[in-house]
From Swiss-Prot:
Keywords: GTP-binding, Hydrolase, Metal-binding, Nucleotide-binding, Riboflavin biosynthesis, Zinc. It catalyses: GTP + 4 H2O = 2,5-diamino-6-hydroxy-4-(5-phosphoribosylamino)-pyrimidine + formate + 2 phosphate + 3 H(+). One of its GO terms (cellular component) is cytosol. It comes from Archaeoglobus fulgidus (strain ATCC 49558 / DSM 4304 / JCM 9628 / NBRC 100126 / VC-16). The gene is ribA. Catalyzes the conversion of GTP to 2,5-diamino-6-ribosylamino-4(3H)-pyrimidinone 5'-phosphate (DARP), formate and pyrophosphate. This is GTP cyclohydrolase-2. Residues 181-378 are annotated as: GTP cyclohydrolase II. Binds 1 zinc ion per subunit.
Length: 378
């Protein structure tokens, strides 16, 4: 990572790899028109990776997200050269947004504050690299394409990087580097927790950037395959038994399955309310759903991506508990994909609940628009 950091410090781009994807990236503070031209010639759309805090501070959330978590903007000029775009990006990340045209050809992407330790994505790794090199936490990157216009795989990317003298790093390299030098969860206390319906657990309390989080642990979890549920906080579903979602039923089923197994972990993720938008915003989304929006479009209408959750903190808690091989209770493929990047061996265990008339549109939207693995009986 030191070689990669040194390269970007000198204002030169590097290559990042993530399984079957690759991208060229550079800290936003040193992007130039020449680099943008190079990206436009060899890559797909240009992305500007910013934290959610930066997006709010710059007022960019007033524009609608497109394609999930992207906001397309440009400088408000008649004709826009690559150098003018580069200058616009540099001024934007320094806090001087100026006049903004929407939509545009620079795609702002929301990244997590704690980088790859919170979400192991290309955008987060690029921002982490910028931080590591001493720049502001923002980066410009673009997915590499083949000469034929297809997505560049690893072999093509490695050859391309060699031809253009670009150092290469992988997301897992950044994760390993940061885990060795940083710790974002702290185990504070452990106590016995007898429950009314699910037997007795060990309640392990952690301090994290998302707040205080509890992991309910049953049996030896530092060996063999371990049943794991990473459950997103849902006051309305878990406590008030709302029919709008299936969250409460999923939590109950998971705890029952762990109790029957006699071994497992349930992590209750604070800060995940409303897929990360918070309780009041979730209620606002409910109101929009009453007016005809689905659960995904309601979040977008409020100025949020469809899903702001990430699972890096849960991954660090599982590491602290010495869990290595996971049978993950989930219907969310994103959760599986993210946790695998932290080195866990994972097999999915479906968690099925019976839909009702009220939550059926919600579940269908999650399946159709977010790719959740939900089966409906005819």
């Amino acid at each position: 990572m030191e070689e990669v950091s040194s390269h970007v410090k000198s204002g030169k781009p590097v290559m990042i790899l993530d399984s079957e994807k690759s991208a060229i990236c550079i800290p936003a503070e040193v992007v130039s028109g020449e680099i943008l031209n190079f990206m436009m010639k060899n890559c797909d759309e240009i992305r500007l990776a910013l934290t959610w805090k930066q997006i709010l501070n710059l007022g960019l959330n007033r524009f609608r997200f497109q394609n999930g978590n992207l906001i397309p903007i440009d400088p408000n000029l008649e004709k826009i050269s690559a150098e003018e775009r580069a200058k616009f990006i540099r001024e934007l990340v320094s806090g001087n947004a100026g006049d903004i045209k929407y939509p545009g050809r620079i795609f702002v992407e929301e990244t997590k504050e704690m980088g790859v330790l919170e979400r192991p994505g290309i955008a987060e790794a690029c921002v982490d690299l910028a931080r590591m090199a001493g720049f502001a936490p923002s980066a410009v990157y673009a997915p590499l394409m083949t000469a034929e216009g297809g997505v560049a795989g690893e072999d093509y990317a490695l050859k391309f990087a060699k031809e253009h003298s670009m150092p290469v790093f992988r997301i897992k390299d950044m994760i390993e580097f940061r885990i060795k030098s940083e710790k974002i969860v702290e185990r504070v206390i452990e106590a016995t927790l007898p429950t009314k319906f699910y037997g007795t657990f060990r309640a392990v309390g952690y301090k994290t950037p998302l707040g205080e989080i509890v992991a309910l642990v049953k049996g030896r979890v530092d060996e063999g395959d371990v049943l794991v549920r990473i459950h997103s906080e849902c006051l309305t579903g878990d406590v008030f038994h709302s029919l709008r979602c299936d969250c409460g039923d999923q939590l109950e089923n998971a705890l029952k399955m762990i109790d029957r197994e006699g071994k497992g972990v349930a992590i209750y993720m604070r800060g995940h309310e409303g897929r990360g938008i918070g309780l009041i915003n979730k209620l606002m989304a409910y109101k929009l759903q009453e007016e005809g929006k689905d659960t995904v479009d309601a979040n977008i209408e409020l100025g949020f991506p469809p899903d702001m959750r990430s699972y890096g903190i849960a991954a660090q808690i599982l590491m602290d508990l010495k869990v290595k091989s996971i049978r993950l209770l989930t219907n969310n493929p994103l959760k599986i994909e993210e946790l695998k990047k932290y080195g866990f061996k994972i097999v999915r265990e479906p968690i099925e609940v019976e839909p009702c008339e009220v939550n059926l549109p919600y579940l269908k939207a999650k399946k159709d628009k977010m790719g959740h693995l939900i089966c409906f009986n005819d």
